[in-house]
Amino acid sequence: MFGVLNSDDRRAAIQQPNILAFGRTSSDLWTSNPTSNYWCETRGNGRDSGQNRVRRPMNAFMVWSRDQRRKVALENPQMQNSEISKQLGYQWKMLTEAEKWPFFEEAQRLQAVHREKYPDYKYRPRRKALPQKSDKLLPAASSSLLCRQVLVDKWYPFTYRDSCSRATHSHMEDQLSSSQPVNIANSLLQQEHHYSSTSLRGSPETLATHLSADPPFYPK
């Protein structure tokens, strides 16, 4: 029994230095691989943080509006930033070239300093994020009803005022509700050709007048 305990103690003592050595090895790998450090620090997104990003040098309008924006914000604390920008843009356009010239000179000086400080700087505009398209589809019932309404409105835009055309319209709706999509398209094309060659030569009012003026026919 004592021999078993001694062997277990020796095995634990051997494993402990191995665990410590593995910890030192993993820490050495962490410090010697800057790519993995950068990936973990940036959470894998590969983008620079806002502190490391180099900003563009200010132009003349930005130099002028830097102080003017504070004044407008203090005078109108309820005004939104977009409204302040619109007002500043209007005021800048109203200035003369002589009034704008000192701000152009200051902007040129700032651009020269920026060029000396960041000689390899290149402006890279940020792309706007595209809105994500919804993958949700309409239910089968609503999509079939919408398709049915579109087909009826497309092929039969005129108003049904007489009893004959009302009956035809109700018959068409029954066909649309009971037929398959391919049969619907074929029947619509055939009936549209028939109506365009016969009943649509005149207006619906003229057609109703003709139907009421003709005497009824009684077979003998």
UniProtKB/Swiss-Prot annotation:
Gene Ontology biological process: cell differentiation; male sex determination; sex differentiation
Keyword set includes Cell cycle: no
InterPro entries, alphabetized: HMG_box_dom, HMG_box_dom_sf, SRY, SRY-related_HMG-box_TF-like
UniProt key word Nucleus: yes
Keywords carried by this UniProt record: Activator, Calmodulin-binding, Cytoplasm, Differentiation, DNA-binding, Nucleus, Sexual differentiation, Transcription, Transcription regulation
Region (Disordered): 193-220
GO molecular function: calmodulin binding; DNA-binding transcription activator activity, RNA polymerase II-specific; RNA polymerase II cis-regulatory region sequence-specific DNA binding
One GO cellular component, as annotated: cytoplasm
Subcellular location as annotated: Nucleus speckle; Cytoplasm; Nucleus
Classification via SMART domains: HMG (SM00398)
SUPFAM superfamilies referenced in this protein's UniProt entry, alphabetically: HMG-box
DNA-binding residue intervals: 54-122
Subunit structure comment from the entry: Interacts with CALM, EP300, HDAC3, KPNB1, ZNF208 isoform KRAB-O, PARP1, SLC9A3R2 and WT1. The interaction with EP300 modulates its DNA-binding activity. The interaction with KPNB1 is sensitive to dissociation by Ran in the GTP-bound form. Interaction with PARP1 impaired its DNA-binding activity.
Function: Transcriptional regulator that controls a genetic switch in male development. It is necessary and sufficient for initiating male sex determination by directing the development of supporting cell precursors (pre-Sertoli cells) as Sertoli rather than granulosa cells. Involved in different aspects of gene regulation including promoter activation or repression. Binds to the DNA consensus sequence 5'-[AT]AACAA[AT]-3'. SRY HMG box recognizes DNA by partial intercalation in the minor groove and promotes DNA bending. Also involved in pre-mRNA splicing.
Family of the protein in this entry: Belongs to the SRY family.
Protein name: Sex-determining region Y protein
